[in-house]
Amino acid sequence: MGVDLRQVVAGILTITMFVMLGQMLHRDYFDSLQEKAQGDAQDIEFEGSKVSVKDGLVGTVEGSKGLWMEDNTDLTPCWPTLLSDDAVSSKGYVTFSLTNGPEYHISQITDAVMVAKHLGATLVLPDIRGSKPGDERNFEDIYDADKLIKSLENVVKVVKKLPEEVSLRNMAIVKVPTRVTEDYIKEHIDPIFKSKGNIRVASYFPSVNLRKSSQDGETDPVACLAMFGSLELQPEVNAVAESMVERLRTHSRKSGGRFIAVDLRIDILEKKNCHTTGVVGSKTCYNAQEIALFLRKLGFASDTTIYLTQPRWDSSLNILKDIFPKTFTKEAIMPASKRSKYLESVSSEYENVIDFYISSRSDVFVPAISGLFYANTVGKRIALGKPQVLVPAEISETSGLATDFISPYISKKNHLAYSCFC
């Protein structure tokens, strides 16, 4: 029986369309996971070519032949022109703590600043609490207190300590949904503040998704300032993290000093049980072997330098190192003189903020795990002009295009950060 050539061609086209649709759905799903939190047209230069970003879609322009995108420095903060210069009053105090790592700290700082600003209260610098009882640090152990106070001086009064005459025991604890709005503060928090005089704020996370929504309206410029213009590492921690970035670039001389950061942590992978989502080629998270195959099929060379957020080397990572020998965890690239303080501490806060710093500044970021670390790292990368975020997937073919796996946060410009940068 003869074969109709038109039917064969039509069949091939149909299969191709389903594969493309599966990849698109996967990337959207990875960004839209609604997880519960712990405890409560511009041009982007490619290597030797360009990628055009139009109407939220990313595609290669003729002549594209590289995997490394150049930084995009076109975006600038919108909030300086939108902030009011009204004097900061001081009717009482707002206290809070930073918990669960830097990806949560950003949101917790933002919520506390918003509450203090719209209540006309004085904000007290937070302490930093780890996952274990009694695991506490001063804010200044990790972050630059003077930078935060200076950045907020015309918005919110910030003090380093609560006056002795004010007791924490008498403060009302107010749970605040992350991305809290002025309207919510007026309706739910202001009455408590007026009654008690001082409050303690605790953020909770109904979702770890940071997509901007049409229902959100304009992002409050105070929130933009707090999220992207106030929180920096203190000088010593910053210097250690930057030295590690430079060491990774030294290992990457053949690729112009470029390297990939992969958020891959064995303990989290074991807890999440990386199950399939029902969408072709998509999962909730990816192990070392799957990340290695993903990067190899995209065409990254075997001498590509890769940084992993995994705290210490684990035998399950060997497959990744077999394919990409220049794969490192932090103990291999941290200066020897700093390891006792930053790697042998009971608390993991130093390691967490270093991971966030390196992941935000790498030439490519690959989130093996969907969650708030991914979402806030993308936000920081947008602020720094580093849009190279590749969402992993199981590539059924022998190879794939990196531009097919750009995070929708970037390709569709639907991350909250795009409301804060023009």
Swiss-Prot record:
Predominant subcellular localization, coarse grouping: Golgi
- Cross-referenced Pfam families: O-FucT (PF10250)
Q: Which CDD domains match?
A: O-FucT_plant
Q: Any S-S bridges, and between which cysteines?
A: none
Looking at its record, which EC class is this enzyme?
transferase
Q: Which UniProt keywords apply?
A: Carbohydrate metabolism, Cell wall biogenesis/degradation, Fucose metabolism, Glycosyltransferase, Golgi apparatus, Membrane, Signal-anchor, Transferase, Transmembrane, Transmembrane helix
Q: Where are the transmembrane segments?
A: 7-26
Q: Name one GO cellular component term.
A: endosome
> Which molecular function GO terms apply here?
mannan synthase activity
Q: Name one GO biological process term.
A: mannosylation
Which pathway does it serve? Glycan biosynthesis
Q: Which residues bind substrate?
A: D263, L264, R265
Q: Which residues form a coiled coil?
A: none
Q: Could you tell me which residue ranges are on the Cytoplasmic side of the membrane?
A: 1-6
Task of the protein: Glycosyltransferase involved in mannan biosynthesis.
Family membership, please give it. Belongs to the glycosyltransferase GT106 family.
Protein name according to UniProt: Protein MANNAN SYNTHESIS-RELATED 1
This protein's species is: Arabidopsis thaliana (Mouse-ear cress)
